[in-house]
Amino acid sequence: MTATLRRDGALALVYLAATWLTAAVFMGDTLYYADSVLGMTGGRITPATFDPRGNYSFFEFGHLLWRPVGWLCYLAFGALARRLCGGDARQAAVFLLVALNWAAGLCCVLLLRRVLGYVARREWVIVTAAVGFTCAYAFLNFTQSGSSYVPALALYLAGLLVLLRGGERVTKPLRTALGAGVCFAGAVCLWFLYVWAVPAALAAPLVLFGDDVRRRRLFVYGALVSGGLTVLLYVGAVVGGLHLTQLAQVKAWVASSGHGLDNNRGVLQVVFGLARTFLSVGRDNVLFKRFLLHDPYNPVTAFDLVRLSLWKLALFYLAAGAAGLLLLGEGRGRRVLVLLLLGAGPVLLFAALWQGTPPERYLPLYPVAFMALACALDAERRRAPLKTVLLAFVLALVCVNAAALSTAALGRRQAAMSARTAELVPLLKSQSVVVEVKEELKDLQWEFPFHPLNRVLTVYSAVSIGDAESARWREAFARRATEAWAAGGDVWLSRRLLEPRPRAASYWVEGSDPGITWAQVNAFFGQFEQGQAVGDADGFVLLARTPRNENALRALVSSP
């Protein structure tokens, strides 16, 4: 067995152990993708299907090829997946999407090890950086989800490696550009945000190996191939798939990829979100919002943040500063620092303009970030304190994220949800709906899609903070409740809706949407007549189907 295979095998074992001992705590839009795959298979969705919110479009602007890839996978392996999932088609589709991500994640780790070899010489440095990458929060989480982020990252890393191999000594620039360009186009078509990271990858040979005519030619060829193929695929989807012929229709399609979200932008969101993509903060992001917005129900002090969360942010930015100082100390490091700025700058700018806190937003800068980490650790100058900070950061990546995503911790969360709904489940009809606001039951469906409760429990969040249509949350609830009644189901309300203040353990942050207050939510649900109650003080009450309740809900449904 060669040394390369031994090293690959060791990193593969690290990846296997990391994903065996942990699970995703945030699955993104996995269920939307699974439902789209099943809809396409069953004929309910066609390539021309356009959802104004982007959730069920077969060709979605932000993830153009992910649903088609999932659909083809389901056609090939759906029967086997259904047998493994007890005949549940939805869980089978989720299983296949997660399997694709897991395989892509393994490819990412092995590809990154080779990429790091171009900026670091010591094997222990390369392994340390690769282990840190494996355990970084966004990667470790989403490699176990059904979203497209990690497969896109794998293609991006493959394209970067092709360019570095062909760009060190340029002999066949067109062939190299074709290989890299196909990979980059695939990455962008799986997740459009990689478009902000591709220019840095194209420039990598010029930055790392020096400027010459052949590398400039490679840059131009790569840009033409990746850009041209991306445009060709998008035009094909718009014209041949969606059959959009007017500019206004195309604009609406592009806008639908925002999924109706309209806030969460700004520099502060980037400061928090960038650190969060590497180190899990759990629910600390809720505490951070409560502190910034001076939540009157669940106030958070600066001391609370320091004690619970800010040390992680401090460690991240301390490590970033240490890496910067080490990179500035030698010529190779300065070149890597330039590449880091080229790769991170556009990603950070876009995050400041739209949705800066989600951890997946920063996955496109992972390759250059860990290249910078490896190069800094590999620096020739002996600056032990700075390197100690970097090693402490890598250790924190392993320990903090392994604890946050551990299967044991997530199992306890699921057990608590099961216990809370134990008395409710036997009373649920197939069309019944359980209503809550910013609570954990919705997590059961979206973050733990294989949990057996998902086969009997349909959860509706009465208010979606940050949604462009959140101002009409009353009308949306009325519509959902009347639909459940018309289908023969019941509507159950979480008792937490009827409490005068949101619980500290909830996700509610007063002021995160200026147009919605807890007092409004509490007063709205408190006006309805109630029926049977189940469980303890943290249980559920039946929304009684009385003439008074029906009239109130019908009035809301018919309101303009």
Which residues fall in each region the model found?
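Signature aromatic-anchored transmembrane alpha helix within multi-pass, membrane-resident enzymes
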Residues: L174, V182, A223-G228, R332, ...
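Hydrophobic, aromatic-rich transmembrane alpha-helices
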Residues: M1, L13, F291-R334
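Perimembrane helix-loop-helix junctions
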Residues: R165-R169, W196-V231, V235, V239, ...
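Luminal/periplasmic acceptor-recognition loop/helix of membrane-associated glycosyltransferases
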Residues: K429, E436-K438, F450-N549, R554-A555
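Membrane-embedded, lumen/periplasm-facing catalytic core of multi-pass transferases
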Residues: L397-F448, V456
